[in-house]
Amino acid sequence: MPRSPAGPHAVTAPASRPSKDTLRYPRRGGSRTEWLTENDVATAYRARFTAAAEREQRLAAIEEDLVDALAARTTPHLIVTVVPEQPGDMVIDSARFDRYQQELLGAQLYLGQPGGAFGRVSVGPRRLIVTEGAGRYSARAELHRDGSATIALSLSGRIHVDDYEEAQLHTAEPGDVVYPLLCALPFLAAHARDRAAASGLAQASVTLVADMAAHPSQTRVLDPDRPDIVPFRVDRIDPGTGRPRPLTPESYPHATAAAGVLLDNLADQGRGLLQAAAALADELLQAYGYPESGLITRAGELNPAGFSQRTCGTVAQWAEQHGLLEPL
């Protein structure tokens, strides 16, 4: 039985007393197999749950670092984070940094579009920092040595203004939320797998904020000169009028979703990526009145035509290249 963060694992083994086979917990001790006592099993389960809590803390910490770096931004962003269950180890030195830099400057971030989205790669504390540019709408990713990674992507949408040209409401279509999620997951998973040599399961989360000040980590920051947070909704567009068609009058400044994922499934950009994206997108969009996204099913079936006008063609092209338009 290989090691995993889900241990201890029970196996069918001969009973120590005259009876049928029972479930027992093995442990490798040198070249021999040892059987765990009840105390050993209890300790192992405690270690499992402690490790899960530490991953949650790790996820929150690296996301907070990213939000702190972008704290001045006042427009809607999607923040996606992936933390492997078994940490990897990306070595950072001069020779390897040159290689990482070349890889990342040519990497494809936006699915269905040519590579080369990023313009700058730099070194931070135990991480690589990758940015599109210096603008307030540019993407920023932080790729950590242990394989954990997070990225913030500005959301495309509409800005509704009053007579004085002051923003009163930001809206985005479901496709403008799901597409950047679909792009971020394989990019982050590829870092964990290919640079840090992490593998297996990971914890993935997605956070949608109307304004970086709406992120939970920023609630303790008081800035009297900062403008108020502009309300945000996810609205479909009425094809007849071209105007937003809200499902709910409520606006939420902050929404989150989380799921367990397989790194290989995400990095390989196959059906597993669609299934993971569907689980996250459905949970995220429920905050805005949608039972499910309607764009990707939990089985991994994709509906490119349901995406927004600016993303549907790109999604269809990418899906065709990867054989994901075939019915299941």
Located regions from the model:
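Bergerat-fold GHKL/Histidine-kinase-like ATPase
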Residues: 30-328
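Divalent-cation
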Residues: 1-18
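Segments surrounding the PLD/"HKD" phosphodiesterase catalytic module and close analogs
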Residues: 14-34
